[in-house]
Amino acid sequence: MGIHLGEIGIVLFPWFLWLSLFLSCGYAAITISSPLTLGQTLSSPGGFYELGFFSPNNSQNQYVGIWFKKITPRVVVWVANREKPITTPVANLTISRNGSLILLDSSKNVVWSTRRPSISNKCHAKLLDTGNLVIVDDVSENLLWQSFENPGDTMLPYSSLMYNLATGEKRVLSSWKSHTDPSPGDFVVRLTPQVPAQIVTMRGSSVYKRSGPWAKTGFTGVPLMDESYTSPFSLSQDVGNGTGLFSYLQRSSELTRVIITSEGYLKTFRYNGTGWVLDFITPANLCDLYGACGPFGLCVTSNPTKCKCMKGFVPKYKEEWKRGNMTSGCMRRTELSCQANLSTKTQGKGVDVFYRLANVKPPDLYEYASFVDADQCHQGCLSNCSCSAFAYITGIGCLLWNHELIDTIRYSVGGEFLSIRLASSELAGSRRTKIIVGSISLSIFVILAFGSYKYWRYRAKQNVGPTWAFFNNSQDSWKNGLEPQEISGLTFFEMNTIRAATNNFNVSNKLGQGGFGPVYKGTLSDKKDIAVKRLSSSSGQGTEEFMNEIKLISKLQHRNLVRLLGCCIDGEEKLLIYEFLVNKSLDTFLFDLTLKLQIDWPKRFNIIQGVSRGLLYLHRDSCMRVIHRDLKVSNILLDDKMNPKISDFGLARMFQGTQHQDNTRKVVGTLGYMSPEYAWTGMFSEKSDIYAFGVLLLEIISGKKISSFCCGEEGKTLLGHAWECWLETGGVDLLDEDISSSCSPVEVEVARCVQIGLLCIQQQAVDRPNIAQVVTMMTSATDLPRPKQPLFALQIQDQESVVSVSKSVNHVTQTEIYGR
């Protein structure tokens, strides 16, 4: 009467088949009886998107999210429980009894829900090929809820932003708090109810960036969206019902996305089959920041960007403008006459006129007027004494400004025409002024030419070659090289303020000795701590490097870059004031036998990732391409949470447009970190920084200095030792032995970092990865290229040194080495 094994197999086979299909293919839908649990995923029918649990940066926090299924590294496009992560080992995403989608922890507590109950629980949740998670009624197949109506930081094709003034409903994008924290951050992207509408990025309650009004096919504040641009977006407004909808359409077969980053950048990406290509980024320069030049100020997108007053206006507070603070803007030089109801044909003396400004982004605070043509628009503004400007824009019609003109940008190409109201005397005197200025200029030129000729004749008679001398009667005149528009938002400190803060540069306040001078801790009167870099006269950092550091850092904003608060100039004294970082520099911990134990492998890996993100910002994501040229362990500062910040930009260089490399007659940097092509030919590029990053990476892993490491009888350098470790054990043995036993690191992670470091220090620049590839290598599990044996530098003395080489075109003529 027993059951044969064959019969058992026949009975159980369908169940095993169902189970294997379930585990391999993922859920088709989520129902009351089939919840989604940790470790399981729900895929879209075409396999484009996937829903499941994920943990940012391998933390203990678990989130339910949607990501691109077949793309590595993972790109999360939506998070359900972004404000409340799961911290228990068990969790379920299921349909509740009232038809809501709910997330339960191990105690059956509701962590997150859709908060929109349906009529019944006869429904299911599924993921569409658009990336939209939907709840569908089993009977009517109507959509009861969808994730596209509750966006996070990302827009996908077929999603939208909206507002409804009657109900108060709005659909916005909100940034993550950080790269590893999906909770709502500082930035929100929303559609405004203005007519016509525009897209604004808010930082808290303040406008951070705006697109300009929508003109049928694009935004007037985005020059890229010209007449030839095929827009993937559409915008519709129903003014009567108080609604607006901004939709993202699918224009190609490529995967695309729009994201607001935790740093406030709005970016558009497309996937080309091998990686994500950045198509658009804003803000791209200082002019993109809202109201950078204040009311009636004009931000000019030249190189570099700069502020100026509109025609007929002057700085409101001249001293503030000289100090680089333009946010107060400009005021009229001549008050308006404002004689209303006069036609342009009968204008006489004293009647207001309009000055036409081309290639501009229309200012904010505009009002739509239903005039049928440009002439009516002109007359409508002229007849209204409070109207300060007008514009008649194709695709919009007439816009009027009855307030201050704020956030106006002038482009080199593109943009609109803006007519500004001025007193008639502002234009009447312009022709007369040109004649006077031209006459004076011609007279001065003739006088100088005659004087130069007489001087040349005199020197010829004396048989002495011409000598040019430039005299400077002001000890601070070099400061004029700092154009105010280049250092907007920077504070100029008085010397007595800094002396008081640092206790007159007391030795007890000294934090350390940098390459260009000592660094002191200071405390301002408001109890704010600062770090003061005091440049010594013999430091080697002259006026050029000092001005370079001020101009450069003031334009860069990233969580992994040190923040410049201001500077102080007093005679020959030059000081830079930075944010104070309590843990000083990385070398303080890394090379100290006791302190190094505080930075175990997880902390070191976090530091490596932070530095790579900072370098990615410099090379790719900032408003300019920046080559640091002196990346090293002592230039990595640590905050109170051991997050790294790249510092010391005195030697950095900026690239514009498509420029990828440059050379210099003066090779500057630190021995051991300089790439071969830079050290011997002066040629530098992004790959020069990559080489230095590779050395830095190996130092962080090993806990050894590049300048003092010596191994074996052959005296191998750190690079040579790293190469041998990689050949023998995959690089695991390179890890600092003082932490290798205590922190039980993931060997695969260490080995991967060693291999990345070796790829970065390849002899030929073309063999090194770029920083975007480095970041991808660190965050993915794909196979890495095999590195070639690097060129190992000769062992150098136990002292970190900065080298400055002045070279001719074909050979090195002089080398000077300074202690760093």
From Swiss-Prot:
Catalytic residues as annotated in Swiss-Prot or TrEMBL: 630
A single GO molecular function term of this UniProt record: protein serine/threonine kinase activity
Cysteine disulfide partners in this protein: 287-299, 293-307, 377-398, 381-387
Top enzyme class: transferase
Extracellular face of the membrane: 29-434
KW Zinc (keyword) present: no
Pfam families reported in the protein's UniProt record: B_lectin, DUF3403, PAN_2, PK_Tyr_Ser-Thr, S_locus_glycop
UniProt main location, coarse: membrane
Domain Bulb-type lectin: 29-148
UniProt key word Lyase: no
Cell compartment(s), UniProt: Cell membrane
Membrane topology: Single-pass type I membrane protein
Residues that hold ATP according to the record: 511-519, 533
Keywords recorded for this protein, A-Z: ATP-binding, Cell membrane, Disulfide bond, EGF-like domain, Glycoprotein, Kinase, Lectin, Membrane, Nucleotide-binding, Phosphoprotein, Receptor, Serine/threonine-protein kinase, Signal, Transferase, Transmembrane, Transmembrane helix
Protein name, as recorded: G-type lectin S-receptor-like serine/threonine-protein kinase At1g11280
Originating species: Arabidopsis thaliana (Mouse-ear cress)
